[in-house]
């Protein structure tokens, strides 16, 4: 089959159990196109049921789903790429850009807008055989609600290949309430490449609305299965590097209530890790976070953040709280302020700067005839004896 089309426009009382864009148990469909407006559906697969497809395209608007959504096939490969637009719709369980126990040999691209996901959203696939060989992109805007977590990778499904570590996972969050955590990587799987997490960062291509993240932002993946007590960070969830960009410019409400990790949760990266925070809080209206941890470089510009601190069971002092932990370099710039309830652990370098474009100028202060002159006003406040 060259091209398959499934179209539903404003159906009345339409209820469908399973939708497949491709064939059933055999054959190959080159391109699948699913366009649904309205209706109630249990499970949806952009690809086939145990039957390969080349490319899948799924656009839904105003639908209700009671099961799960897959951009790929069910136990069936997609030979090239998947493309998903999930708009003004709701789903009771999880949404995946990839397949269920089926590979995607190219890329996955998922756009969630003005929608409700009562489970988690994954850019990748579901299950150990649901590898995405190329890149993954997940973009969320327009006051979407994700009740659980957001992953730039899959669920127990790798992204990229061990012998070709060039995959890129990109998360773009322009407007959403996410009650759980944000992960640049996968859930209990490896991303062979690098992750880029953009939260409110130059999201001009999307509809900006308030951003609320109830949990923690991890540049990497979730290493531990539920109930696993092992948190030694020996698992490598991202092989080539992590970048987190947080920019609250032009947002009225923008809050992250957990910590910010340049690693995964109980997982690490072999490459460099960067956290860039801009326009996040003011001196009189600072942002509340728990900690900043496990990264090579943190750059904070024009921001004010209160860090309450937390423990790290892998530290020698495992019951001691730290506001900043295992950060190789901290750059505080452009009139930024940190309020630290607890101290720092293994912070190797700290600089106070004025940054203009790519130019960095070390903070200076002069006192002349009782007049104080600064080129920048960065501050760090710590509780006594901390």
Segments predicted by a language model, with ranges:
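Outer-membrane translocation/initiation segment of Type V secreted surface proteins
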Residues: 368, 372-386
């Amino acid at each position: 089959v060259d091209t398959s089309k499934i179209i539903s426009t404003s159906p009345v009382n339409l209820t469908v159990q399973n939708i497949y864009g491709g064939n059933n148990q055999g054959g190959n469909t080159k391109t699948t196109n699913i366009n649904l407006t309205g209706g109630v559906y249990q499970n949806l697969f952009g690809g086939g049921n145990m039957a390969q497809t080349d490319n899948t395209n799924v656009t839904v608007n105003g639908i209700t789903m009671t099961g799960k959504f897959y951009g790929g096939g069910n136990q069936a490969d997609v030979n090239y790429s998947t493309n998903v637009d999930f708009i003004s719709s709701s789903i009771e369980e999880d949404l995946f850009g990839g397949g269920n126990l089926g590979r995607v040999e190219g890329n996955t691209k998922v756009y969630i807008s003005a929608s409700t996901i009562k489970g988690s959203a994954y850019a990748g696939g579901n299950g150990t055989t649901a590898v995405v060989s190329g890149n993954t992109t997940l973009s969320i805007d327009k006051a979407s609600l994700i009740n659980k977590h957001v992953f730039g990778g899959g669920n127990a499904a790798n992204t990229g290949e061990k012998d070709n570590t060039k995959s890129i996972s990109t998360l773009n969050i322009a407007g959403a309430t996410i009650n759980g955590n944000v992960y640049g990587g996968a859930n209990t799987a490896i991303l062979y490449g690098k992750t880029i997490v953009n939260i409110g960062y130059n999201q001009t291509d999307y509809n900006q609305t308030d951003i609320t993240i109830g949990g923690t932002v991890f540049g990497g993946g979730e290493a531990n299965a539920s109930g696993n007590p092992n948190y030694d960070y020996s698992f490598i969830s991202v092989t080539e590097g992590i970048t987190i960009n947080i920019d609250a410019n032009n947002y009225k409400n923008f809050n992250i209530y957990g910590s910010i990790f340049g690693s995964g949760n109980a997982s690490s990266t072999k490459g460099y890790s960067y956290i860039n925070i801009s326009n996040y809080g003011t001196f009189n209206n600072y942002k509340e976070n728990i900690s900043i941890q496990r990264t090579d470089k943190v750059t904070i510009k024009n921001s004010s953040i209160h860090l309450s601190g937390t423990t790290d069971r892998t530290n020698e002092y495992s019951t001691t709280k730290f506001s900043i932990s295992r950060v190789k370099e901290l750059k505080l710039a452009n009139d930024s302020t940190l309020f630290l309830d607890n101290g720092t652990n293994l912070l190797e370098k700290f600089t106070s700067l004025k940054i203009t474009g790519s130019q960095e100028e070390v903070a200076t202060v002069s006192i002349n005839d009782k007049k104080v002159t600064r080129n920048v006003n960065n501050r760090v406040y710590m509780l006594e004896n901390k």
